[in-house]
């Protein structure tokens, strides 16, 4: 035992920072995903595989894809900037945060209005396979998801401020919307309509946004960062250039969710709901297994890059990536065997039948195949982000989306919702191969590759 402790103590401090951060994120993710799983159990109990769940899944995916995409881009390009600003601090950092929060808040309001007014066209174009009742329900749910578009942007900035300081409590607060929805669904007098899903979602995201803002201010010594609509910070050109390039790839990848919803909607027979249950179970494994390491790695790798030690950052990322591939392969084997049991334990009660369990487990198994490649690629994404290699990242993302779009049209008609999951798995095979090939190159990255 003492020998093991000594061996662990000899691990490089940067590896220890990633491990400790990943452990904290994994614990928070486990708690958060547990809350999410309980919420899904409650939804399955009250609604089963029904029109209400179809509407909820469709509206949540379509209504949040753009703000989630923007937050994803900002997180990747913001954290290295915030890590560097942490070394300087003072008025320069405060000005940047105030301006950032001002423009993000303005963009959030604009995005909420855009979501509201564009929704009829979204449903008309992408929800052609939905019944009239489901379409009407999506309109009701928009009362929640239009404001949520703005709240997601504001919360994303607060989360990035926390992550830049290697504080990962924001991961735990990702569960707040699920907890609020759970409470509304279980306390509702009946499961008629989508009211409990609507109000639980809206209140949950509002609480999460305020809570994250308070934690970010406390982490910055009480600095809230009153919004300011100016562009005087010298960091804007760097940030906007990187964000513009990243947004191209991220928008392409963000269409994967709506693309899946479109394919499932055209399959009919509540395929949206079946795919949604399987996807949310899969997200539990993806989150705990890979997101924990990815979120912990970016600020550490950015700090190593800021010190000028590019070779160490590359070596660290490759070691962690291969370790995560092995862990993902083990998760596939275990998950394939336990899929029917897991779906049954979580969902099979109330309106959710044994037939529903078999359908969701079948789809889930095909989705499990993505685990090794998703696990492995996420740490390599953080490496390239810390090196500002955004053009390469954008190109890989566009290639991923192109492959996914082709495979959906080929596999979904033949395999149903399982084909949609298999297409996602093959997409991540391509992604991992591309990122590994780029990461293996020993050439020094350019300033803005």
PLM features: residue spans?
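Interfacial transmembrane-helix starts/ends
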Residues: 19-23, 57, 61, 78, ...
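Alpha-helical transmembrane segments of multi-pass membrane transporters/permeases
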Residues: 23-28, 147, 158-185, 369, ...
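Helix-loop junctions and terminal segments of transmembrane helices
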Residues: 72-88, 291-309, 381
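Short membrane-interface helical motifs at transmembrane helix boundaries
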Residues: 111-132, 332-354
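Alpha-helical transmembrane segments of multi-pass membrane proteins
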Residues: 117, 130-158, 184, 352-380
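Hydrophobic alpha-helical transmembrane segments
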Residues: 173-219, 399-403, 417-441
